[in-house]
A protein has these predicted regions:
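Residues at the starts of beta-strands that form the adenosine-phosphate
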Residues: 8, 34, 143
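Generic beta-strand/beta-sheet core signal
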Residues: 12, 38-40, 114-117, 147
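C-terminal catalytic and target-recognition region of SAM-dependent MTase-like enzymes
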Residues: 66-110, 117-223
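Conserved SAM-binding loop of SAM-dependent methyltransferases across substrates and taxa
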Residues: 1-9, 125
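S-adenosyl-L-methionine
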Residues: 12-107
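Hydrophobic residues in alpha-helical segments
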Residues: 3, 49-50, 131
Length: 223
């Protein structure tokens, strides 16, 4: 669905057969140029994407064109206001062989979908302190969508607390959405939250919030 909207996707699966079929499905649906597929451990995959990059990030800003020599001042002014073609970026330059190796360092993205409900929540710790401030700057940090299960006797707040335990920090305005019943007394949920800068960049305030007692107020969760 993301690629149908023209979004670029970094995808990963530890199972090599799943990764192969992921590539084949992307090609069959004619979105291969928008999907980069990897066969790595989930933590290694995320850390590789978040490592400081050697150059510009995947998204390049428009660069004003330089006026050409000669011609009138009026025509030169028009050329100055016209954006120059974007230079090639790492995404476009990646080959299928590079898909097989390490993901590009210095990538930026808006959403993370962790769609293995049996264990995804256990990997939330990988995001804490993993972001490079020079790469992200003032850019909005990504929203995490983590699928998980809950028992019938658990509340949504219980799921949030479990997620915060694995993240190692409090979540800002977490939202919990019921997906479907999978068995008697077992419900699949999606826990969504946007990373705080203190957590993403590993600043001291994030540590304080993680070890804060139960007196602090939790934002109201979405029911």
């Amino acid at each position: 669905p993301a690629t149908k909207a023209g979004l670029r996707v970094y995808a990963n699966d530890l199972n090599p057969h799943c990764a192969r079929y992921l590539r084949e499905n992307a090609a069959a649906n004619r979105v291969k140029n928008l999907v980069k597929c990897y066969n790595l451990d989930a933590r290694a995959f995320v850390r590789a994407l978040l490592a400081p990059g050697p150059g510009p990030t995947v998204e390049e800003p428009d660069v004003p064109a330089e006026p050409e020599s000669g011609g009138s001042e009026k025509s030169a002014g028009k050329r100055e206001r016209k954006p120059a073609p974007k230079p090639p970026v790492r995404w476009a330059a990646m080959t299928p062989e590079e898909d097989e190796g390490a993901p590009p360092a210095g990538a930026v993205f808006d959403h993370v979908t962790m769609n293995l409900p049996a264990s995804a929540i256990e990997f939330l710790d990988v995001f804490k302190g993993a972001f490079d401030r020079a790469t992200w700057g003032d850019r909005k940090l990504p929203t995490i969508h983590c699928y998980t299960f809950k028992r019938a006797d658990e509340t949504k707040d219980d799921v949030i607390k479990r997620g915060e335990g694995h993240l190692g920090a409090r979540m800002a305005s977490p939202r919990v959405r019921e997906v479907r019943d999978v068995a008697p007394n077992k419900i699949m949920l999606c826990l969504s939250f946007t990373l705080d800068p203190e957590v993403a960049f590993g600043e001291d305030d994030g540590e304080k919030r993680a070890t804060d007692g139960g007196e602090s107020k939790r934002p109201r969760t979405e029911r």
